[in-house]
Amino acid sequence: MCIRDRDLHADQIQGFFEKPVDHLYASSIFVPYIKSLNINNLTIASPDMGGSKRAYAYSKFLDADVVICYKQRSKGNVITHMELIGDVTGKNVILIDDMVDTAGTLTKAADLMIDKGAESVIAICTHALPVSYTHLTLPTILLV
C-alpha cells in the first residue's frame, strides 16, 4: 500500500508516514487547465516566498514571467507588510498556492497586484481548508 498526496505543504511530510508516499504535483492538472484558458500577457505569481519554487516551475511550463510577494507577519495569520517583487503592469496574473486557510494572504496579494496595475488576478490552489471565506471581495479574486 502507498499513500498518494498532491502538493505537500513541505517535502519533509513524506517522512512522517510509515508507508511509502507518492508526492504528486497538482501542476499535472493545473497546467493544461491554464493553457486551455488562452490567457494573453500571462504572469505567474506566488503569494509568499515559500511558494517561489512552485511559481517558477509553473512559469517554465507556461512560458510566462514570474512575480513573488514578500510578506511579514506579526503573529499567526496577521500580515503586517507585503511587497511585490516583479512587475505586473498590464498582466493577467495567475496566483498559485498550495494551501488556503483564511485566504488573507491570497486576497492581500491579489489586491496588491491590482493596485500595481495587473489587468486580472486568478487564484489557483490545491488545498482549501474548510473555513469561512465570507470576507473575500470576489471581483478582486477568483478562486478556481
Predicted regions and their residues:
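Active-site glycine- and acidic-residue-rich loops that bind
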Residues: 45-52, 127-131
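Short, structured coil segments at secondary-structure junctions
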Residues: 17-19, 62, 117
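Active-site-facing substrate-recognition patch
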Residues: 4, 9-35
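Short, glycine/charge-rich flexible loops or terminal/linker lids adjacent to PRPP-binding catalytic cores
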Residues: 23-27, 31-33, 37, 49-93, ...
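Helical hairpin unit composed of two closely spaced alpha helices linked by a short loop
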Residues: 110-133
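Generic enzyme active-site microenvironment
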Residues: 5, 46, 95-99
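Thr-Gly-centered strand-to-loop micro-motif
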Residues: 95-97, 102, 124-126
